């Protein structure tokens, strides 16, 4: 579960609160948190986490020397248990001090391995869609190892589904949530953002104060993966809605630009917290 630098500890605490995982099942690393969790936990984290950028399932870790080793490693992953050849996919690759001369070529070799594996196992190859793929595969290469992941989130998790109106430099929802976590605010005392812009911080705070899960208004990548069971997912949604409650603290926001206050009010309405936040225009 990748996150912004410095947020790892807060994310680990959040994942523990969501799943109950502890000890060796929940480890903090540089730029993210790793968990040994169930498929149900993966869906629950997607639904409830405010801090992670996405939830990735690690499928393999392999030593390599060249691009052909990448092909071999990717061809040994059972992609056919995750999606079908009728679906589209995309390879995203990142590197940390990799000796490879071209990451684009490395991604192409992994893509070929996935497609060839499907042709061998299912008789046809899935197509690539670099814009709106059904399935996102992530590859990370270090000087010696290749790690392959399948994405369960789809669009980045900062996209909550309620922000339609935004200013010129909107604050990502995950960063706003990290700022709230770092402040130590526990939803029992009032919160005031005097430069609220389009309302990101007050809206995140209001949802926290009301127990509203951040992912209730969006779709997720796991809904297109073969392990997905809709009745289990609907149960998690119902469970989340059952935990919503009246606000535990008042939330306030203001901005010198009345246009931004209007944006904030409309965003708050879509986020289900319009009656929880008091917005006003004026100089801080």
Where are these regions (language model features)?
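Short glycine/proline-rich turn/loop motifs
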Residues: 94-96, 158-162, 242-245
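Short loop/turn segments at secondary-structure transitions that flank enzyme active sites
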Residues: 41, 97, 145, 154, ...
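Conserved S-adenosyl-L-methionine
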Residues: 171-283
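Non-catalytic nucleic-acid substrate-recognition regions in nucleic-acid-modifying enzymes
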Residues: 1-135
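C-terminal edge-of-domain segments
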Residues: 137-153
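SAM-dependent Rossmann-like transferase core, predominantly class I methyltransferases
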Residues: 148-184
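Beta-rich nucleic-acid/ligand-interaction surfaces
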Residues: 132-139, 198-199
């Amino acid at each position: 579960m990748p996150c912004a630098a410095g947020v790892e500890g807060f994310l680990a605490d959040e994942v523990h609160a969501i799943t109950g995982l502890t000890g060796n099942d929940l480890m903090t690393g540089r730029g993210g948190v790793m968990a040994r969790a169930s498929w149900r936990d993966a869906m629950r984290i997607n639904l409830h986490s405010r801090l992670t950028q996405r939830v990735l399932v690690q499928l393999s870790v392999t030593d390599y020397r060249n691009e052909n080793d990448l092909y071999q490693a990717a061809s040994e992953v059972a992609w056919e248990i995750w999606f079908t050849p009728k679906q589209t996919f995309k390879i995203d690759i990142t590197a940390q001090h990799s000796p490879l001369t071209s990451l684009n070529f490395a991604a192409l070799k992994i893509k070929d391995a996935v497609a060839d594996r499907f042709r061998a196992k299912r008789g046809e190859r899935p197509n690539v869609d670099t814009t709106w793929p059904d399935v996102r595969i992530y590859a990370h290469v270090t000087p010696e190892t290749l790690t392959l992941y399948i994405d369960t989130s789809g669009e980045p998790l900062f996209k909550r589904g309620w922000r339609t109106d935004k200013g010129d430099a909107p604050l990502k929802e995950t960063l706003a949530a990290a700022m709230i976590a770092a402040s130590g605010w526990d939803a029992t005392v009032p919160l005031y953002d005097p430069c609220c812009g389009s309302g990101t911080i007050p809206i995140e705070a209001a949802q926290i104060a009301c127990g509203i899960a951040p992912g209730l208004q969006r779709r997720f990548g796991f809904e297109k993966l073969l392990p997905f069971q809709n009745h289990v997912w609907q149960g998690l949604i119902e469970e989340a809605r059952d935990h919503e409650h009246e606000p535990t603290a008042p939330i306030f926001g203001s901005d010198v630009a009345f246009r931004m206050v209007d944006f904030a009010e409309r965003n708050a309405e879509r986020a289900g917290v319009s009656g929880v936040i008091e917005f006003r225009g004026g100089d801080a």
